Amino acid sequence: MTAPVRIALDAMGGDHGPETVLAGAEISLWRHPDTSFVLYGDEARVTEVLKSHPKLAAVSRIVHTDVVVGMDDKPSQALRRGRYKSSMWRAIDAVKLKEADVAVSAGNTGALMAMANFNLRTMPGISRPAIAAIWPTLRGESVVLDVGASIGATAKSLVEMAIMGSAMARVLFDLEAPTVGLLNVGVEEIKGVEEVKEAARILREENLDVNYRGFVEGNDIGAGTVDVVVTEGFSGNIALKTAEGTAKQLGSYLRAAMGRTWRARIGYLLARDAFRVLREKMDPRRANGGVFLGLNGIVIKSHGGTDAEGFAAAVDLAYDMVRNELLARIEKSLVGRQPPDVAACRPQAAGVEGQS
């Protein structure tokens, strides 16, 4: 019998704390009954909320801590004040100590990345971690990274992300040779900053077993032009938030238009099934959850403001990463595929101050 997937939850993370975290965990548990949980947070509060989730309570244990990383805390402050005591740190530490297979938090992104990087460390050959998101596209789904782990990138780190993103796409989408593109301001080879152009040269010329297809632009992400889109964290995070905002905006436009006249209401009723499919496709909660790639352990970041359904999607992703042995597959992908050292200015370190 297969052992259950052990998930460590930062029960206090996010805008809504245990209420959303535990409700989302139970939704995911219905889909993946071979899961157990360790809940890190205020024992009294977690126990009280858990009374409403008996199925989750039956497969969970609580580890008390009353130290919580705030959404506005700087990563350096979070590390100094409660590094070894906070619910966020304890969840990550459980992965390091092999007490859990994966950690999930909806807390402060910068603090989570700083703690994960400090505690788990990067894999051999990886200069820094990246956050990878699953992106709905016209052709299905793609992997986009980095979406906010750090600002700026060297050519070497972009190539590392291409290798890790390819491994993730193989795991998630069951692809033999996922296509990879570098996000740029144009598809012509002469365009872009030097780091991006140098990364493109390495991916073209070095034998890294990456199915590189060239530069892609912002509109190619949603079009699904490639299976993996690689970019640095600043532009990646802006692209992610823009896409989420656009989806919500279009949803609001549709709701307003459908209720404007009686003809529109009748039309909505006649096409209700089609609108339901559209609504599900545009729901950003379906793609909630970013994977911290490049660390010696799996950490999943949920949006802080998500609801129970959104958090459940992040827990689902955590489950899939463990069941599909993402860590082992990335390590295997890195063997013999290290990009050469390239001269590039060192950008701002991972765990950017003020991220949330």
Curated annotation (Swiss-Prot):
Top-level taxon: Bacteria
Chief location of this protein within or outside the cell: cytoplasm
This protein's record includes keyword Lipid metabolism: yes
Gene Ontology cellular component annotations, sorted alphabetically: cytoplasm
SUPFAM superfamilies named among the record's database cross-references: Isocitrate/Isopropylmalate dehydrogenase-like
Recorded metabolic or biological pathway in which this protein acts: Lipid metabolism; phospholipid metabolism
GO molecular function annotations of the record: phosphate:acyl-[acyl carrier protein] acyltransferase activity
Lipid metabolism listed as a keyword: yes
Gene3D superfamilies cross-referenced by the UniProt entry: Isopropylmalate Dehydrogenase (3.40.718.10)
Catalytic activity from the UniProt record: a fatty acyl-[ACP] + phosphate = an acyl phosphate + holo-[ACP]
InterPro entries: FA_synthesis, Phospholipid_synth_PlsX-like
Biological process per Gene Ontology, one example term: fatty acid biosynthetic process
Location within or outside the cell: Cytoplasm
Family: Belongs to the PlsX family.
Assembly notes: Homodimer. Probably interacts with PlsY.
NCBIfam families in UniProt: plsX
Protein name: Phosphate acyltransferase
